[in-house]
UniProtKB/Swiss-Prot annotation:
It catalyses: (2S)-2-hydroxy-3-oxobutyl phosphate + 5-amino-6-(D-ribitylamino)uracil = 6,7-dimethyl-8-(1-D-ribityl)lumazine + phosphate + 2 H2O + H(+). The keyword Transferase applies. The keyword Nucleus does not apply. Its EC number is 2.5.1.78. CDD domains: Lumazine_synthase-I. Catalyzes the formation of 6,7-dimethyl-8-ribityllumazine by condensation of 5-amino-6-(D-ribitylamino)uracil with 3,4-dihydroxy-2-butanone 4-phosphate. This is the penultimate step in the biosynthesis of riboflavin. The gene is ribH. This is 6,7-dimethyl-8-ribityllumazine synthase. It comes from Bifidobacterium longum subsp. infantis (strain ATCC 15697 / DSM 20088 / JCM 1222 / NCTC 11817 / S12).
Length: 155
């Protein structure tokens, strides 16, 4: 039996990051977590590109353009959608998740989902670096692992 696994060796890896500006008090913490992890795992600063978009809904388009450019081994998508009193939350969450997943499938580039979808600001804060860890950091680790997994499968 042959088992494929990705590791956290970040040699010659280029990463694109798409960050939503809406709820920036949360998304900036997600970005800081991602950047800290990438640097800790020895991804060079010149091998990281960050694109800011207005809101979570715009993330899939820029993630798709980055993935199709073939300049990045993985894309990390960061945003925060917090439930309000209208159905807008449901539409945004559904479309963003579909768009991100479709980008990965269409391009073969790992596209990591670091978009928080929470019922409250408190839940978002917890997932951006307090009680529940930092989703940006988790996505950075996942990006490195997925790049190496794909490389190990390219026989």
């Amino acid at each position: 039996m042959h088992t494929f696994e990705g590791d956290l060796v970040a040699e010659n890896i280029t990463i694109g990051i798409v960050v939503a500006r809406f709820n920036e008090f949360i998304t900036s913490k997600l970005l800081a977590g991602a950047l800290d992890t990438l640097k800790r795992e020895n991804v060079r600063e010149q091998d990281i590109a960050v694109a800011w978009v207005p809101g979570a809904f715009e993330i899939p388009l820029i993630a798709s353009r980055m993935a199709k450019s073939k300049r990045y081994d993985a894309i990390i998508c960061l945003g925060a959608v917090i439930r309000g009193s209208t159905s807008h939350y449901d539409y945004v969450c559904n479309e963003v998740s579909k768009g991100i997943a479709q980008t990965s499938l269409d391009t073969g580039v790992p596209v990591l989902f670091g978009v928080l979808t929470t019922d409250s600001i408190e839940q978002a804060i917890e997932r951006a670096g307090t009680k529940a860890g930092n989703k940006g950091s988790e996505c950075a680790q996942g990006a490195i692992e997925m790049v190496n997994l794909i490389r190990s499968m390219d026989l």
